[in-house]
């Protein structure tokens, strides 16, 4: 199955489960969790079901395209459903079947691995899902986001698309993956990967990055004070990515790292509180929405 077909198949599968299908969020982030469609929607009592592919950036993971299974830019497929439905593990296994994995014939294990994002003030209990010894998915019941308790508890399912593709295509190098029947993953992303690694490790200006971090932090703080959680989150994400760039340059000491993570986490808490206040003032409108039955088409 081609890389783009994995995304199409997961879109179709999760749409059939009632998920809203969305597109990637338009700023740098280290994980699909950081999209407002997950990190904000996980907060508060309103029901939510969403699925989307998300490009992710982790500057320190770059290897100039020389590593067969590691890159600073990669893709996740993100699912968030709140409240967590009964039988979600079986539904997830059905999604693997939709991708062509006969679950009865393969070794699929749920290996306990609780998840945490210190910068987001988020954590959950869950598992890594291993397919024949390779981790392909993270399965997490969120307990907190932005330092706020999640009630009801959502389920987050995060597929590593490259790893799934390597398994499905029986390929050992991500750059050799077929994107479609004409182009490889490397055709599309390898040149960009090399250039971005140069920036991450050599060409970026650490002093300028530190200035940017301070500016983004100030902007986020001002927006939180104005009770504007959506744009404030954008600048929190910019803080997070800039911090990751500084780490890639090797200019963050252990003490600075702890302090900087604390600064970002404090901002994330402010965004979460502002979001919850905003939704409460609106009367939590999604609590009153009635879903259309799946067997009834929209009426024009």
UniProtKB/Swiss-Prot annotation:
UniProt-listed Pfam families: tRNA-synt_2e (PF02091)
Keyword annotations from UniProtKB, A to Z: Aminoacyl-tRNA synthetase, ATP-binding, Cytoplasm, Ligase, Nucleotide-binding, Protein biosynthesis
Enzyme Commission designation: 6.1.1.14
Biological source species: Prochlorococcus marinus (strain MIT 9313)
GO cellular component, as recorded: cytosol
Superkingdom field: Bacteria
Name the record gives this protein: Glycine--tRNA ligase alpha subunit
Subcellular compartments: Cytoplasm
Keyword Repeat recorded: no
InterPro entries, sorted: aa-tRNA-synth_II/BPL/LPL, Gly-tRNA-synth_heterodimer, Gly-tRNA_ligase_asu
UniProt subunit comment: Tetramer of two alpha and two beta subunits.
Similarity-based family: Belongs to the class-II aminoacyl-tRNA synthetase family.
Any one GO MF annotation of this record: ATP binding
GO biological process: glycyl-tRNA aminoacylation
Family annotation (PROSITE patterns): AA_TRNA_LIGASE_II_GLYAB (PS50861)
Reaction catalyzed: tRNA(Gly) + glycine + ATP = glycyl-tRNA(Gly) + AMP + diphosphate
